[in-house]
Amino acid sequence: NLTEKVDIKALLNRDVRPVLIIGFVLAAFQQWCGINIVFNYAEEVFASAGFGISSSLFNIVITGTVNMVFTFIAIRTVDGWGRRKLMLSGSLGLAFTYTLLGIIYYTTSGGYVVLTVIVIAIAIYAMSLAPITWVILSEIFPNRIRGVAMAAATSVLWIASTLLVLLFPFIKKAVDISGAFWIYAAICILGFLFIRSRLPETKGKSLEEVEKKLLRK
């Protein structure tokens, strides 16, 4: 209809390109930070650490519970701590835990040390990139393109998720699971640098203030 045509035309305007880039990169980064590998390939990840099937299933329950609990904590802290700070700390925290996981997998079989570090990584993700990305996406797009821009960013997120899941077996085969976690650590560092340089704090800002700040970039 006419409204959708107007929205799409506004989306293609060069003036909104900077904010679209930020939104699309954050959407892709939420997936390519790598934590969904733990969820989608949990049994394989834990098997590589020496756990049997029954232990792996128990570990999956633990990681799922941690994810839920810390997501609720994030909902209560997002306005106090700020979106940008949570995204930056989450990116660095994941980079550190992935680097540590890579070292553990490379040097030992892992065992419960792997489970502990993975639980920490999930807690970090659940308090930062998982929920806060959606909060930011809802705040950074100008009103005139918000609907179609959110739809486009969501599409980018799911495409990134699909690619992440499809490519992991090939990455693991090429560089082993330790190398895979080091690759995700590097992606998290790149995400941290992007957020630090391109994303302003949106907490307590009106939509108009956020738009002015982002469209100047």
What are the residue ranges of the model-derived segments?
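Alpha-helical transmembrane bundle of multi-pass membrane proteins
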Residues: 2-217
